[in-house]
Structure formats: C-alpha cells, structure tokens
Amino acid sequence: MADLISYDDAIDAAYDIFLEMAPDNLEPVDVILFTAQFDDRGAAELVDISDDWAGHVGFDVDKEIYAEVRIGLVNEENDVLDDVFARMLISRDPDQKFCHILWKRD
C-alpha cells in the first residue's frame, strides 16, 4: 500500500471537492449562506469516523485509510460546527481515490 496522504491534505481535498460540487447539491440559499459567512464562521473539520458509513457506502470502512470531514458553519456562541453542509468520507490512499458525500437536506 502507498503512503497515506496526511489528514491536512485530506481536509484540503475534501474542501476542494465540496466547493466544486456544492452548487449542484445544496439549495441555492445554503450556497449563498455558506459563501457569505465562510470567512467568519466556516470550517472544514476532521472528525472521528461515524459508524453509519458502512450503510451508506456498502463496505466496512477502514478507519486507518479513510477520513471523515465535516464542512459547514460554526456557532459563534459555543464554537461548535453545528450547521453541517456536508459530511464527507475520503480515502487517504492516493492509489485508491474515493469520496462519498452526505449533503445537507432541509
């Protein structure tokens, strides 16, 4: 197996994919909100991989090879990322590129 990409690089890749795909997968109002408030409240955070991913992707997720990134807006009062626009599962193996996104739905 190849060397895994760093968690920082996984976050960067997830954010780039999010920006490219958000206009086609989020409500227009959410795209406007995220764009307008990202500089002040936006975040792309690495989190512990949730156990529900196997049900979404159809295979057992190796928590050493994959990373979960959440992208959204942080609540200014408690500094918690609580307005999540996308949950992303991304492979850190450069030879096995994979990304699955769960988008915010109203």
From Swiss-Prot:
Pfam hit, one: DUF440
Intrachain disulfide bonds: none
InterPro entries the UniProt entry points to: dsDNA_mimic_put (IPR007376), Put_dsDNA_mimic_sf (IPR036763)
Alphabetical list of HAMAP family matching this protein: Put_dsDNA_mimic
Family per similarity comment: Belongs to the putative dsDNA mimic protein family.
Its biological purpose: May act as a double-stranded DNA (dsDNA) mimic. Probably regulates the activity of a dsDNA-binding protein.
Name of the featured protein: Putative double-stranded DNA mimic protein VV1_3059
Taxonomic source organism: Vibrio vulnificus (strain CMCP6)
